[in-house]
Amino acid sequence: MPNYKLLYFDARALAEPIRIMFAMLNVPYEDYRVSVEEWSKLKPTTPFGQLPILQVDGEQFGQSMSITRYLARKFGLAGKTAEEEAYADSIVDQYRDFIFFFRQFTSSVFYGSDADHINKVRFEVVEPARDDFLAIINKFLAKSKSGFLVGDSLTWADIVIADNLTSLLKNGFLDFNKEKKLEEFYNKIHSIPEIKNYVATRKDSIV
């Protein structure tokens, strides 16, 4: 078994699907939380000047979705066929498109923007993008006979999207009373015993 070390800030955000995957598969790894002070020194040593970084036996890999996809392929969660892999990849790509808008909100909150600006971003930027994004996810779920987004078993797309739904819930962008199909999906993924146990004991954050 390779030696894995995941480096990211002390938050869920872009690294959490990686952590969930490791936890679900009981793969040992070091979950290293980088402080703001450490980051200024560490940044020049990283491949892209960004976190997360996954170290595998000393080799450094960057870009969160590339890392997650790499592990999904390695651990059999990328899809059972080339077509399933393409569907899973496309769902995650759509998620990345949405995150561009969502991060405008979380950044505004993090950096202490005034309430008027935060509300403007919420209502004029994020909510329209959220509506489009969730409509697409609902279309995949409507076609699914298994309750998973792709095929008849869990893929990395399920892990990524379910974790993003957590962030939407925590920030007031999702109401399961109005999104029953998404609630069923969310509960299905979070009822997987290993994921359920991990989520119950992890250090939480709003993103």
Swiss-Prot record:
PANTHER family: GLUTATHIONE S-TRANSFERASE, GLUTATHIONE S-TRANSFERASE 4. CDD domains: GST_C_Sigma_like, GST_N_Sigma_like. Conjugation of reduced glutathione to a wide number of exogenous and endogenous hydrophobic electrophiles. May play a role in the detoxification of reactive oxygen species produced during pathogenic bacterial infection. It comes from Caenorhabditis elegans. Induction: By paraquat. Induced by white light exposure. Its EC number is 2.5.1.18. Residues 2-79 form the GST N-terminal domain. Transmembrane segments: none annotated. Glutathione binds at Y8, W39, K43, G49, Q50, L51, Q63, S64. One of its GO terms (cellular component) is contractile muscle fiber. GO terms for biological process: glutathione metabolic process. This is Glutathione S-transferase 4. Keywords: Transferase. InterPro entries: Glutathione-S-Trfase_C-like, Glutathione-S-Trfase_C_sf, Glutathione_S-Trfase, Glutathione_S-Trfase_N, GST_C, GST_superfamily, Thioredoxin-like_sf. The gene is gst-4. GO terms for molecular function: glutathione transferase activity. It catalyses: RX + glutathione = an S-substituted glutathione + a halide anion + H(+). Residues 81-207 form the GST C-terminal domain. Belongs to the GST superfamily. Sigma family. Gene3D superfamilies: 1.20.1050.10, Glutaredoxin (3.40.30.10).
